[in-house]
């Protein structure tokens, strides 16, 4: 949590945020958040459309996700999409005024061969479609992330999902530390980061602050 009053920016610590939560009503917090957003962002929004570029049969057991092979769901299951289909989807979104386009794949990560296929898709989109590029492809290696950046991707998405102290209650097949490592590697590769989480999965109010 960070509050800014020009020219000084001040980042709240855990104890301060906890005290603010305990002594301020939800309505007051919503109003303060609205005022900060209005002051520093106004009515501007950043639009990003995602394409489910590989669906289902994920090896991870994340309790919140229908893509996991451990859950019985009725989602479509298909392999990595073709280049032409992805380019057409990006072009459709660009024609609607969307500013960013992201390929999102199920699964823990991509193989090097899959990474090369995805990078070829991004290079073609970059040549043919006026839209900025993002990616959400799992726990990639440093080398794979560098390839993405060289292919024109600007933002990498990797959600932390919840507080580190609660993560193991929701997922046992990877750790918050692995996510943090991926994010750090993405930064080193020159990518900007998009990372968030889900509120309301059984975590405590204190863990929500820990997550923030």
Residue ranges, per PLM feature:
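Conserved, mostly hydrophobic/aromatic
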Residues: 9, 33, 62, 103, ...
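Oxyanion-binding "anion nests"
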Residues: 197, 209-212
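Core AdoMet radical
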Residues: 70-89, 93-183, 192-196, 201
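Short glycine/threonine-rich loop-to-helix capping motif typified by GTGT followed
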Residues: 112, 206-209
